[in-house]
Amino acid sequence: MATLGVNIDHIATIRQARRTVEPDPVAAAVLAELGGADGITVHLREDRRHIQDRDVQLLRQTVRTHLNLEMAATDEMVGIALDIKPDYVTLVPEKREEVTTEGGLDIVGQIARIGEVVSKLQNAAIPVSLFIDAEPAQIEASVKVQAKFIELHTGRYAEATDETSRQQELAFLATGCEQAIKAGLRVNAGHGLTYWNVYPVAALPGMEELNIGHTIISRAALVGIERAVREMKQAIRGE
């Protein structure tokens, strides 16, 4: 069964809304791990809208499971990753005007650049995951650049408004997952997953880890982080 990476970006979003010192994402990560999180995920954006450099530095020192650093494939971010050495990096697309990551990374269209970044990071013993749509060409390109992982973008599945569309998107993810595993990639997934839609994705053969943030932090506002994480672990198990 898939494991759970808890994205704590939105703890930082609340903090940055008032430009203050609380709530602290580092404390949130501790509570998430106490609740059963298998990993902690943060996205250090170029505009620093939520997670800050200080957060990543402290999380590297305090996280006891594993730290997944989401970032754009820029020279600045590569330098930060090489300095901090997270347990792995997930390369994601990034636009300043977006509210959240809107789609998968286009590996096909920038294969030389992505290949260069993957090589730099993995030569420093930092495994790389690529956040992509479950399209055959993108999966093939991920193999070519020698990434260790892909993270399948589950946004269209999560946003499906009827059961027929949802099943079509789930089948698309299942096919992509199978293709990737056959090609030697390890497979994670994330984006838009909630307590109510997570199980079918978690149950896909070979699915390793689900990176989930907003729905957990939303639930945590009502019941606390530890309980919110425990409930998501139950949802992943289909309980």
Swiss-Prot record:
The active site is at residues 43, 70, 191. The keyword 4Fe-4S does not apply. 3-amino-2-oxopropyl phosphate binds at residues 7, 18, 192, 213-214. Its main location: cytoplasm. 1-deoxy-D-xylulose 5-phosphate binds at residues 9-10, 45, 50, 100. It is an enzyme of class 2 (transferase). Belongs to the PNP synthase family. This is Pyridoxine 5'-phosphate synthase. It comes from Trichormus variabilis (strain ATCC 29413 / PCC 7937).
